[in-house]
Amino acid sequence: MKHKVKVTVIGKKLYPELQQQYCADPNSGMCPCYNVGDEFIFERDEQNDHFWHGGLNTLVKTTADPNTVAGGPKMPHCSEAWDAISRYIYTGLQGGSIMKGRMKHENEMICCCSDGTRPVIFKVERIDEE
């Protein structure tokens, strides 16, 4: 059985009071790297190894210019996001249970990047193919 992993941006948050208090640019705003609804497909086989390349060119759906989205053809995933999602992507690509017992479906995980003033929320989903 072959496995792919789909990552979807399902939310973006902003905490302006924290940006005002702690950020060098107190008006930095929402994360510029991702958009709600962005979708990425990761494969790892003889032709592709998206995991090894930090998710470069895994973007399959966006409402923005693909060249400006992390994971698009021009830039790999943001390091803060990659740190949050890569372990689940790797597990899914190997056919493993992403979060058995915690999530309703063991092939899914909801996680977010570690930017505390403007986190991005991701759904990571293992897709099983014959």
Name every feature range the model reports, one short phrase each.
Residues 1-4, 34-39, 129:
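A short, structured loop/turn motif at beta-sheet edges
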Residues 3-5, 12-25:
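Short, structured beta-strand/loop micro-motifs enriched in basic residues and often containing a Trp
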Residues 4-8, 121-123:
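Beta-strand secondary-structure signal
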Residues 9-13, 126-128:
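Beta-strand elements of well-folded, non-transmembrane domains
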Residues 15-17, 50, 130:
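Residue-level signal for secondary-structure boundary sites
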Residues 21-48:
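Short, flexible N-terminal segments of the mature chain
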Residues 47-80:
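Short, Lys/Arg- and Gly-enriched loop/turn segments at beta-strand edges
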Residues 79-130:
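Short, compact, well-ordered microdomains
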